[in-house]
């Protein structure tokens, strides 16, 4: 089962279900908080920063952001103006810009910007690169400032009982594929629970929205196991599938890893999720949370509870570290040493990500993806591999002949040729389909993980042959396309477009001669 199928659908977004989809999106991107109550998360999502006490709707903000990405609105100042933020004559001229800064900070802390990118089919590392463990900083947002994490932690602490039959089903799962499959089996039965809490967050109900509709329901099991084992002595690691890259060869079956290779990682993931339920859900900055997120009657009561739990937790944590290290407890140990041990114990393990330059990756995958490109052509067009190889070889050679020389590079044609070649190679890094192939244009649709793109190669009929025989690839969101799996017209594309370009060049020369002749006649008449 594909991991991206657990993300909410972006095609039926409306004002009634956008909050529900946001909660589902956050739970899917933060699987460590499986079983959390999403009522406070829904409240945080709908709490757009106010301006002079004026409240704004999240659906209106989404529509304006979509128009901003579509270049209908060309600045954030105009966007907040359409949202309803106004500056009076006696107010500062920086009021609009100050609210823009507040709005962007709130969107970053709640990851609403990543959610909007997902709905608008734009890549974002928040949902494309889910880390193995919860990092201290994610998408430039510290965990102490992350409103999504705070809401989910508070939801874990106030979660009611969960059905025991679902827990037994989850514990018997031995592989990530079974883990997600068991969760998706109850997707239809539990989706209405999430929607009911979003639409009516104050309703008295025994059921609450849980990520069993996304991943699994395990809050009750976390609380039971967390009270017995507040901290594990050995840090556990768990793995989640990483999304495919546009320039990396994809898996042939586009499936999650096999159970034999990942059953041990799944056990670690389940144990780590259990430990998050109690001890790790206690935040030292609990008293700094907003009142609507803490949901407590008195700040003093919250502070006292937090202090007592923090002292207990820190004492147990320090003793466990000392016992593991075999260090005898000495009187008069400096407080700095204890703080250092606790700091090292609490620091999360961040996996190293090696960044490879684009050109190095291009050179390494050139041969492999060329083979994949020919295979994709052969499969879609139902042509033999020999015919496809000859066709593409002639096609790319014709392109390289008519590319303009590069002024910055000492080797002409090479950067431009790599640019167009990489565009062609990226088309087969995942499922691709030929939508239209004619003498005018070649249109593809590419499905890359949760993203979908339509790419059009239009043959340029206006410029001379010495400039471009093929225009650059254009991303087209919505175009009327006639579906066709036939590639027979491509056999004559190179010759036809060259003849048409020559005719256009000759026509331009005739028009230029005609204009010069008219100019001479007019000069002779007036002289």
Swiss-Prot record:
Residues 284-303 have a biased composition (Basic and acidic residues). Changing residue 333 to A: Loss of DNA-binding. Changing residue 331 to A: 40-fold decrease in DNA-binding. It holds the Pfam family Abp2. The modification Phosphoserine is found at residues 297-298, 302. InterPro entries: ARS-binding_2. One of its GO terms (cellular component) is mitotic spindle pole body. Residues 164-177 have a biased composition (Low complexity). Residues 160-184, 219-265, 282-344 are annotated as: Disordered. Residues 225-239 have a biased composition (Polar residues). Coiled coil: none annotated. Its main location: nucleus. Residues 328-343 have a biased composition (Basic residues). Binds, preferentially, to the Maundrell ARS consensus sequence within ARS3002. It is found in: Nucleus. It comes from Schizosaccharomyces pombe (strain 972 / ATCC 24843). Keywords: DNA-binding, Nucleus, Phosphoprotein. This is ARS-binding protein 2. Signal peptide: none annotated. GO terms for molecular function: DNA replication origin binding.
């Amino acid at each position: 089962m594909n991991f991206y199928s657990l993300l909410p659908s972006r095609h039926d977004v409306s004002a009634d279900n956008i909050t529900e989809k946001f909660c589902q999106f956050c739970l899917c991107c933060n699987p460590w908080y499986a079983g959390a109550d999403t009522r406070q998360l829904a409240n945080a999502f709908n709490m757009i920063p106010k301006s002079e006490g004026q409240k704004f709707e999240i659906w209106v903000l989404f529509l304006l952001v979509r128009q901003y990405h579509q270049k209908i609105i060309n600045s954030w100042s105009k966007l907040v103006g359409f949202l309803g933020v106004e500056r009076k004559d006696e107010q500062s001229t920086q009021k609009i810009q100050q609210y823009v800064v507040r709005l962007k900070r709130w969107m970053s802390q709640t990851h609403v910007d990543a959610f909007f990118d997902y709905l608008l089919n734009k890549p974002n590392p928040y949902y494309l690169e889910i880390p193995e463990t919860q990092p201290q900083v994610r998408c430039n947002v510290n965990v102490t400032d992350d409103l999504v994490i705070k809401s989910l932690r508070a939801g874990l602490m106030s979660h009611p009982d969960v059905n025991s039959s679902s827990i037994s089903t989850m514990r018997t799962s031995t592989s990530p594929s079974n883990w997600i499959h068991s969760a998706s089996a109850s997707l239809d039965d539990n989706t209405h629970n999430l929607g009911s809490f979003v639409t009516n967050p104050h309703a008295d109900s025994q059921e609450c929205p849980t990520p069993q509709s996304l991943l699994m329901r395990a809050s009750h099991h976390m609380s039971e196991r967390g009270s017995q084992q507040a901290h594990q002595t050995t840090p556990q690691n768990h793995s989640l599938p990483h999304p495919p890259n546009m320039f990396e060869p994809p898996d042939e079956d586009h499936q999650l890893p096999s159970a034999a290779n990942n059953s041990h990682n799944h056990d670690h993931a389940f144990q780590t999720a259990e430990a998050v339920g109690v001890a790790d859900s206690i935040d030292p900055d609990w008293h700094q949370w907003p009142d609507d997120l803490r949901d407590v009657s008195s700040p003093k009561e919250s502070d006292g509870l937090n202090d007592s739990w923090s002292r207990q937790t820190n004492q147990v944590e320090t003793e466990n570290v000392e016992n593991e290290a075999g260090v005898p407890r000495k009187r008069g140990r400096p407080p700095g040493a204890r703080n250092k041990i606790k700091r090292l114990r609490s620091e999360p393990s961040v996996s190293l990500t090696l960044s490879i330059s684009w050109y190095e990756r291009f050179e390494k995958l050139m041969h492999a993806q060329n083979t994949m490109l020919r295979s994709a052509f052969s499969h879609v067009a139902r042509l033999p591999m020999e015919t496809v190889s000859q066709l593409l070889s002639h096609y790319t050679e014709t392109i390289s002949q008519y590319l303009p020389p590069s002024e910055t590079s000492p080797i002409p044609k090479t950067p431009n040729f790599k640019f167009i070649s990489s565009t062609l190679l990226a088309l087969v890094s995942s499922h691709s389909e030929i939508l239209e192939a004619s003498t005018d244009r070649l249109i593809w649709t590419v499905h890359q993980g949760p993203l979908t793109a339509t790419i059009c190669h239009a043959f340029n009929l206006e410029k001379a042959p010495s400039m471009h025989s093929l225009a650059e690839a254009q991303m087209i969101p919505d175009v009327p396309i006639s579906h066709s799996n036939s590639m027979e017209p491509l056999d004559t594309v190179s010759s036809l477009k060259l003849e048409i370009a020559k005719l256009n060049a000759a026509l331009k020369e005739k028009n230029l001669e005609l204009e010069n002749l008219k100019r001479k006649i007019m000069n002779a008449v007036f002289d």
